UniProtKB/Swiss-Prot annotation:
The UniProt record lists the keyword Repressor: yes
Name listed for the protein in its UniProt record: Large ribosomal subunit protein uL1
Key words of the record: Repressor, Ribonucleoprotein, Ribosomal protein, RNA-binding, rRNA-binding, Translation regulation, tRNA-binding
SUPFAM superfamilies, alphabetized: Ribosomal protein L1 (SSF56808)
Any one Gene Ontology BP term: regulation of translation
Role, per record: Binds directly to 23S rRNA. The L1 stalk is quite mobile in the ribosome, and is involved in E site tRNA release. Protein L1 is also a translational repressor protein, it controls the translation of the L11 operon by binding to its mRNA.
NCBIfam families: rplA_bact
Gene that encodes it: rplA
Length: 233
């Protein structure tokens, strides 16, 4: 069991482990627990009642957080033709076609997200799948990063659209803002994510879907959240 310092032990005493907090209570408390010298990211962790070994029970989706994540997202766009100008006008940080594919293949990784038009996916799959796939950066229609509307995809990512998916233990981890956010904005982002997660419930998943949820900041202890009966149905 890892040993925690005096600062962390003092923080964890502020969390009542024998109760579950509403998101509004937790959003206010997490700000009090974020005492690091930087603006900590606030994350939520959902444990799902799924069998992640079965492909028909895996959960994946996207959600536009109404107040964004507080992070500046650097977006790379792989496209060609008129879409180049459209991507640049939408605020993409780097845009290119085969030239950008080659740059990335040669080590260029100065971006946080990659979007592409369908006509570039064959080359991306051939040259970049092994590089971007393990990093979670490979464009995919399910994550809203492949499509004809490059401007819309770029604006969505810049505005705070995030992708969520379960890990191999059936847990979804997702950022919902920064410790500097107003608690009401953290709560609104959480509710948007919760709604998207409920909508993404696999038909093959039986029993209680949302088993538990915790709110935490980068350096702070986790706060157990209450889940309504409706959310667990």
């Amino acid at each position: 069991m890892p040993k925690h310092g005096k600062r962390y032990r003092a923080l964890i005493e502020k969390v009542d482990r024998n109760r579950q907090y509403s998101i509004d209570e937790a959003a206010a408390l997490v700000k009090d627990l974020a005492t690091a010298k930087f603006d900590e990211t606030v994350e939520v962790h959902f444990r799902l009642g799924i069998d992640p070994r079965k492909s028909d029970q895996n959960v994946r989706g996207t959600v536009a957080l109404p107040h964004g994540t507080g992070k500046t997202v650097r977006v790379a766009v792989i496209t060609k033709g008129d879409n180049v100008a459209a991507a640049e006008a939408a605020g993409a940080d780097v845009v290119g076609g085969e030239d950008l594919i080659d740059r990335i293949a040669n080590g260029f990784m100065d971006f946080d997200a990659v979007v592409a038009t369908p006509d570039m996916m064959a080359q991306i799959g051939q040259k970049l799948a092994r590089l971007l796939g393990p990093r979670g950066l490979l464009p995919n229609p399910k994550s809203g990063t492949v499509g004809p509307d490059v401007a819309g995809m770029v604006r969505g990512l810049k505005a705070g659209r995030i992708e969520f998916r379960n890990d191999k233990t059936g847990v979804v981890h997702a950022p919902i803002g920064k410790a500097s956010f107003d608690p009401s904005n953290l709560s609104a982002n959480y509710r948007a994510l919760l709604s998207a997660l409920e909508a993404a419930k696999p038909a093959a998943a039986k029993g209680v879907y949302l088993r538990s949820a915790y709110l935490t900041s980068t350096m702070g202890p986790s706060i157990p959240l209450t889940l309504s009966a409706q959310a667990q149905a």
